[in-house]
A protein has these predicted regions:
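N-terminal capping segments
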Residues: 1-70
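...with weaker cross-activation on analogous glycine-rich loops/strands in unrelated enzymes
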Residues: 2-3, 70-122
Length: 122
C-alpha cells in the first residue's frame, strides 16, 4: 500500500479509547489494568515502558511503524524513534522538513510556555 496519510490516520483512529496501564499487564487491551504509571503497548514495543513522561511520542511513532514498516517510518519521521517530543521536533528541523502549516497525516507538535511538550497527528 502507498505511503498515504490515510493509512497512519486509520491506525491511530483504531487506537481511540486506549488507556495507559498501571503495570505491564494487559497492554493489548484498551481498558484493562487502567492506571497512571505510563505503561502502554507503544512503550513496550520500543522497550521504554513505564517512563515518567507522556507517551504521545511513542504512540505516533508506533502508528507510523505499523502503517509503513520500521525503516520507512524512520524516514518519514526524519531520523529515528524518540520518546521525547523536543527530540522528535529536532529531527524535522535538522532535515529542513519543519513547517508551521501541517498537512493531513503530519506529526504535529504543541508547545507550552517553556518548550514543545506534546504531539499528535494532523
Amino acid at each position: 500500500m502507498a505511503k498515504t496519510p490515510e493509512k497512519v490516520i486509520k491506525i491511530a483512529i483504531g487506537e481511540v479509547g486506549y488507556i495507559e496501564k498501571k503495570s505491564n499487564k494487559d497492554l493489548n487491551y484498551k481498558k484493562k489494568n487502567v492506571g497512571a504509571n505510563n505503561y502502554t503497548k507503544y512503550g513496550e514495543y520500543f522497550g521504554i515502558n513505564g517512563l515518567q513522561a507522556y507517551w504521545c511520542d511513542m504512540f505516533v511513532d508506533w502508528c507510523f511503524m505499523k502503517a509503513y514498516g520500521r525503516e520507512n517510518a524512520k524516514k518519514l519521521l526524519c531520523g529515528d524513534f524518540s520518546a521525547y517530543t523536543p527530540t522528535s521536533a529536532k529531527y524535522y528541523k535538522k532535515k529542513s522538513r519543519w513547517s508551521n502549516i501541517p498537512k493531513k497525516g503530519d506529526q504535529i507538535f504543541f508547545k507550552n510556555e517553556k518548550r514543545i511538550n506534546n504531539q499528535g497527528l494532523q
